[in-house]
Amino acid sequence: MDMLQFFRDALVQETGRHVDNDDFDALFSELGADPLVGVAVIERVTNKTVEKAPRAARPPREAPLPRGNVRNAFQDACSHVQEFLRKAGSANFWSRVYPAQRQLVLAFVNDAFDRLGCSLADMPVGTIVTYPRGVLDKHRRVFDGAIFEILADGGLVNVDPELGAIRTSTVVDKTPPQQILATIILEHPQFANLHRLLNVTGSQFAECLTGRLDPIKLLFGRSKDLLQDFYTNAPMSLAASLHLVAVIKRLLADGEYRPGKSIDILEVGAGLGGTTRFVVEALIEAQVPFRYVYTDISASFFAASKNRYKSLPPGSSMEFLVLDVEIPPPETLLGGFDVVVSTNCIHATRNLGVSCSNVRKLLRGGGFFALIEFTSRMYWLDLVFGLLDGWWLFEDGRKHCTVDETVWEEKLQLSGFSDVLWADVEGDDKSSLQLLVACTD
């Protein structure tokens, strides 16, 4: 294989799109490749490694998980939600942790305004608060979609539909962000790494807004371990994963699983593999053979998981595949899976309905879609992920990329799913990160 062909294949596998010869005159960014993908393409060419094509579609067969039992399994697992929250250290989050987190987020925003020469503390009452000088045009969406709301939530502005954000008489809390951060880490150690992740961008928010610093390099460079920890060990992530595992274990218990049948699972946007670990460990513990297809829009995330799962029990396998959930899946994957899993991925697509419809095409009758997403507005997420393009891709009428359970229910049902289930818990006991299960029958 010549080097040009190898480069083309590497770019196709990293971006999931067709690349013509004419495309080689284009910039990486025009081909859908961010800096991380560019690095991954170069590594592929250097190491001469390519992914195998997806396995041919399996013929239709009886699902190993009898229809109807998914609902029972989910309801049974829901009775243990408070146990999951306690085990994960996320119980009573809204009264115990959120007030300090809210204070920290507002402090980072105030600090950014100060460093951009637009001090809110010195701003007269009635002043219209707008984008500080030097903010990149593309980051104005962070202000429109989050920053002005954060200021309103903190009482520092009132938002008028015509005039915009107007400074109030509320005094700015001048407590330094690093002092608040130190207190949170001391008093809420389970959330320490989550708030350290917030600090990565929050403490340098002004520099990111003006383009002096690249948030992608900040988050995926030396802070990559904090991202991995967030997806795997952050209390709300752990609680949601425990809930998902409980559903799977319940389905495999009491003879509901048909012995001798392997389970076909596909994960959309597997990324760093935080959810994968819980699901695979549950299947291995239950001694259930499985085929697990680990997908992401870029293969740059695959290396660590390939190494982690290179030795699986007999009868089980893991495949790695570049998959863009925003386009129809390849024919080889249609109706090929009993379970599709996705954590913190689908929200970052242009159209929830299109993405959910494409997921539905992957499932066979009796299968289900396990979706883990933030369904409560968490402003700290905007200070971290709001600096990335994927946070603002939506073109389907959403006001923000995160939506509540009722919106997910509507989109999933319109996409061909039947029941959409979630833990109906409100108040201090509600988790900000929810497991939703959508059934196919």
UniProtKB/Swiss-Prot annotation:
**A GO molecular-function annotation:** methyltransferase activity
Q: Taxonomic classification, please?
A: Eukaryota, Fungi, Dikarya, Ascomycota, Pezizomycotina
Q: Report the sequence similarity comment from the record.
A: Belongs to the methyltransferase superfamily.
Q: Which gene encodes it?
A: ustM
Please name the top-level EC class of this enzyme.
transferase
Instruction: Summarize the protein's role.
Output: Polyketide methyltransferase; part of the gene cluster that mediates the biosynthesis of ustilaginoidins, dimeric gamma-naphthopyrones isolated from different fungal species. The first step in the biosynthesis of ustilaginoidins is the production of gamma-naphthopyrone precursor YWA1 by the non-reducing polyketide synthase ustP, via condensation of one acetyl-CoA starter unit with 6 malonyl-CoA units. YWA1 is then probably substrate of the ustZ to yield norrubrofusarin via a dehydration reaction.
Keyword Transferase assigned to the entry: answer is yes
Pathway it belongs to? Answer: Secondary metabolite biosynthesis
Give the domain of life: Eukaryota
Keywords, comma-separated and alphabetical: Methyltransferase, Transferase
Q: Where is this region: Methyltransferase (CMeT) domain?
A: 266-368
Q: Which organism is it from?
A: Ustilaginoidea virens (Rice false smut fungus)
Enzyme Commission numbers on file: 2.1.1.-
- One Pfam family this sequence matches: Methyltransf_12
A GO BP entry is:
biosynthetic process
Q: What is this protein's record name?
A: Polyketide methyltransferase ustM
